[in-house]
UniProtKB/Swiss-Prot annotation:
Protein name: Malate synthase G
Pathway as given in its UniProt record: Carbohydrate metabolism; glyoxylate cycle; (S)-malate from isocitrate: step 2/2
Record EC number: 2.3.3.9
Chain's role: Involved in the glycolate utilization. Catalyzes the condensation and subsequent hydrolysis of acetyl-coenzyme A (acetyl-CoA) and glyoxylate to form malate and CoA.
InterPro entries membership: Malate_synth_C_sf, Malate_synth_sf, Malate_synthase_TIM, Malate_synthG, MS_C, MS_N, MS_N_TIM-barrel_dom, MSG_insertion
Main location: cytoplasm
Amino acids binding Mg(2+): 435, 463
Amino acid sequence: MTERVQVGSLQVAKVLYDFVVEEALPGTGVDAETFWAGADKVITELAPKNRDLLAKRDDLQAQIDQWHRDHAGAPIDAAAYKAFLQEIGYLLPTPAEFSVTTANVDTEITSTAGPQLVVPILNARFALNASNARWGSLYDALYGTNAISEENGAEKGSGYNKVRGDKVIAWAREFLDAAAPLASGSHADSTKYVIDGSELKITLADGTVTTLAQPEKFVGYLGAKDAPTSILLLNNGLHAEIQIDASSPIGSTDAAGVKDVVLESAVTTIMDFEDSVAAVDADDKVVGYRNWLGLNRGDLSEEIKKGAKSFTRTLNGDRKYTAVDGSELSLHGRSLLFVRNVGHLMTNPAILDADGNEVPEGILDALITSTCAVHGLSISDANGPLDNSRTGSIYIVKPKQHGPEEVAFTTELFGRVEQVLGLPENTLKVGIMDEERRTTVNLAACIKEAVDRVVFINTGFLDRTGDEIHTSMEAGAMVRKAEMKKQKWIGAYEDWNVDTGLACGLQGKAQIGKGMWAMTELMADMLEQKIGHPKAGANTAWVPSPTGATLHATHYHRVDVFAVQDSLKGKPRASVDDILTIPLAPSTDWTDAEKKEELDNNCQSILGYVVRWIDAGVGCSKVPDIHDVALMEDRATLRISSQLLANWLRHGIVSESDVVSALERMAPVVDRQNEGDAEYRNMAPDFDSNIAFQAAKELILEGAKQPSGYTEPILHRRRREYKAANA
């Protein structure tokens, strides 16, 4: 039984109450009585509005379902369908031209294009690693991944392989030629880097002394001018540091003594309370809130054990250099942090209202994460030496919003939280995830509702695909999952997001972002493909690891995103008609083998993720697929897989017994993939009593009934069931 404290009309879990009063509030200038009185008022007045918005979602979905049932068996009349969506208020008029007015935004958002990490906040080690991933070793990223082939004697091996190391060095030199080319010759032939007055001079193997083709790209150094230990370059707004130490193991093999090239990598990071975590009660939430508080105070630390050794990981300080003019140059040593709150759907038992109902978790997150973030403001006396924002802003990503009314509710909520905390109006900035269909088709109207708060729009094609399937659940059978990325709507959706963001004046004020690279081990493929994101005009895109951030950073050196955006302005490429094209399968005559393959692939993915969510409380996992390729799975990928199978079940492509058979076939596969985990409990053969297996089955068989196809209601209930059974 949860111990609670009565505060006004609220019943607050004691673990949360104590955290807020004893840890989060001290140093903010807000006393406990003021905070809780304000929180009580916000929850009491806004929770009914939250419920009304969810009811509207259900009402619109019911009308869409009925329209498709009424038109079953006939090809969809695109014009009639669009008119219907307008008639019911799903598709709204585009607002008159406007530009956002967001102010006091850090340069990492306004003028620096680069990678963005997304990290589960419940894991302190991951959170620290991500915060410190502002800078990363290019040599390590290349050597330790498949970015460099292991062919021709270049295997990673257990010790240092000079053949592989030389390939890494050659790749890095080619990168330097692209990012900061020489006036003549190549960095590959460099034998010495020195500073002559205020100019970088490079000696080549043939004795030639040259300079940078664009001398202004040299911005700082460390060490003596005639023997620098670091050369700091700036290209497309991102820094790259050539580190020199001829006595080091790597530097001793390099003609110029270069031991590494360190890149500014994860410029921004989202600390996630949503899809990558499993937080179902007050205890879970407080773990995340405490980590978020520690990041903002600058005192989060974690004891790391590697074999017999252990060390304490903390946040990195700022990086100091000598500028070209001889003054001190200080660069931020940590990623600029956003926090992703949950959406509007779920409630959480951490606080009960006057009627004993769980309060909306999104309201809870807004109140508590904002309180913690006050400590990260450089204008606040609450922060430690390591502040987050230097412009006085708190950056909150708000996911899974459906249309402009819901964005308006978020901005109202943020305004109310500012009043509780005594913060200036518009301190709380919002990142709008464009991952629900009603937000996509009304994106300009959504942005307008946050015209003075928006700092970010981002396509989340995973969740967006889940909503695409669920919205048109009754329309017919959808294409197979692997075919979804080839459908007309998805390309239009990606272009529409950039086009709309630019038309609304986001350039120079906010990020226009793209989604996650999920194949964590396939970095060579990422290097080849993910450059498409900056080329599409996105000034940030998601990566799954610090290493991925460093490699993706090279793309922003090769592509001037702001120049790309300039070329795209005023040239809309996408239409709402294309976005409204439902990805129905043109034919459903799949063979039995094809159906089995689709079932097995999706069931294996679902089980692999759900078993760790339910049993271990892990919300983001590297889950091997049926071919043992590691994929980063979170609730968004689960939503697609479960909704696709629910759709096929609804339209008779597969039967309930087919689904159950596939789950029972795949459970031993997942068990085998987890056999190295001593804590893991097998699902097979006792399927009926295994909570995780039953949750996976429910997600598919009941998928058509789930609100917007979301997985949270079933996952939360089943996780609490597991925790109670194993208390």
